[in-house]
Amino acid sequence: MVRALGDGLLQDGEEERRIKLPPHSVEAEQSLLGGLMLDKSAWDKIADVVGSEDFYRKDHKLIFRAIAELIEDGQPCDVVMLSEFLDKRDELESAGGLEYLATLANETPGSANARAYANIVRERAMLRLSLIHISEPTRPF
């Protein structure tokens, strides 16, 4: 999959920096989104597992919300429809652009593992939430 800026990779082949990031799986997010673009029926497998708030990356949240709205409206959610939908809302560039959407669809092997990817995305979201609660100072009653 395409790695985005800010994912810990430096330019020009330098070593990857070890930055402490909250738990997430960009690969699971990308595979889930790509699978949904390839197979609209995969929505039924994942709708009860994951929501847009579970995605770590903002662009993935936007893409997931757009897919959800298209599916709820009975529309196809392939690359063309998704890019048109996001463009009309002036969110296409924030979602990574047409090229990123095409990459998601083209580099995803299919939708067979959509529920497994959704479970990973949800699990990492729950871990992030737990870390937030653990790191908050306790307040006396």
Question: What do these predicted regions represent?
Answer:
Residues M1-M126:
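Noncatalytic partner-interaction/assembly domains of nucleic-acid and motor enzyme complexes
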Residues I132-F141:
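Single conserved hydrophobic/aromatic residue that forms the stacking wall/gate
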